[in-house]
From Swiss-Prot:
Enzyme class, broadest EC rank: oxidoreductase
Organism: Xenopus laevis
Gene Ontology molecular functions: methanethiol oxidase activity; selenium binding
Record's function text: Catalyzes the oxidation of methanethiol, an organosulfur compound known to be produced in substantial amounts by gut bacteria. Selenium-binding protein which may be involved in the sensing of reactive xenobiotics in the cytoplasm. May be involved in intra-Golgi protein transport.
EC number, as in UniProt: 1.8.3.4
Gene name tied to this protein: selenbp1-b
Residue ranges of coiled coil: none
Main location group: nucleus
GO terms under cellular component: cytosol; membrane; nucleus
Domain of life per record: Eukaryota
Pfam (any one): SBP56
Protein's UniProt name: Methanethiol oxidase
Keywords assigned: Cytoplasm, Membrane, Nucleus, Oxidoreductase, Protein transport, Selenium, Transport
Known catalytic reactions: methanethiol + O2 + H2O = hydrogen sulfide + formaldehyde + H2O2 + H(+)
Amino acid sequence: MAKCGSCGPGYKSPLDAMKGPREEIVYLPCIYRSTGINKPDYLATVDVDPKSPTYSQVIHRLPMPNVNDELHHSGWNTCSSCYGDSSKVRNKLILPCLISSRVYVVDVGTDPRAPRLHKTVEPHEVYWKCGLANLHTSHCLGCGEIMISALGDPCGNGKGGFVLLDGETFEVKGNWEAEGETAQFGYDFWYQPRHNVMISTEWGAPKAFALGFKMEDVLAGQYGHSLNVWDWTEHRLVQTIDLGKDGLIPLEIRFLHNPDADQGLVGCALSSSIFRFYKEKDGKWAAEKVIQVPSKKVEGWALPEMPGLITDILISLDDRFLYFSNWLHGDIRQYDITNIRNPKLVGQIFLGGSIQKGGPVAVQEDKELECQPDPVTVKGKIIPGGPQMIQLSLDGKRIYVTSSIYSIWDKQFYPDMLKEGAVMLQIDVDTEKGGLKLNPNFLVDFGKEPDGPVLAHELRYPGGDCSSDIWI
């Protein structure tokens, strides 16, 4: 982490962050909900230092005090948005729960290699003070508060709102959005104060996705297809951009890291597309599709056509490359976005997925591949599931990937993963010409955990990363 006489947490700029130290440990949530194992979810600490004797191993586990929380994403008590405030210290990891609506605050400052629970925010505080539930993305704000997106109301209906936590006491302060302002659905968000804007995305109604994915729910309007544009200073919803059938279930959203940038990218899961969003001359915002992953005609699967299902995207800190995962097809892609309106595919790697050879699915028509990809084996283990959450090293030269998306959907689309556990892999990245290569020496097999196979999701470095930190 950057050090100076008067600076706060993180780094002065995205390019400064690229010069930060190499990651040595990562934190990631491990989930038992829906697996048949009645144990609490836990925060795992994994050693990713190649020089360490415990490299590629879980070195600590912090179980939560409750079961069936569905730990999912995480954020920080403070980050690079507070770089100018020397009183701020990045020492707490914020863990909102997707199903229970709890928020766990974890102390990672006292002993970074052995985190400890600092505080639990119970769901009734979120219900009563905010009228929200099903928590997802956590971002630290420049003012020192913590903002968490919500996907629904306490009854399971879709409702896109935001919970504010005090950055010191971690008490629920109330809603970020002004009274009466709400989006139809919620999921991820990213703010860009220099343009007085925040944009949020849409998954769907919790009562729909909590029971598994059904195409009927999409047709019934239970899933989102819009970007919601908020006035950052007035906390009002000022515009909704309907992405249409090419933008079904827009999930992860990333502005370019340059705080002056007035554009970014969003991944649309079901449509398997990437949209560029941008500010127009009149101050309104618009979106255009810049990448389309074609579906594959298949036999032996739930539907006659299989989408890629783009479930996570990242932009490198220098705004040169886009990375995303196709959870169903099984590949991670690298695009040169120097010309963001015309991304160029420069790297691709398959890591499992539903179309690999020897599986139940036969591909009948494929607009991209000549044959189905081979299964991937690392250290003797055939990789189950498909690549899902991805995290890029600060220097952009390594990607870490896990295979679980959400326990109910894991159970539905990759039932063997509940028996075998998720995996964590590492990919080497060519940042000159482009290219992705699997590191054969790195595997965390979550099928061998002490309490039985577990699902693993989003990754965080102690010093921040390209999806946790926002520069203002």
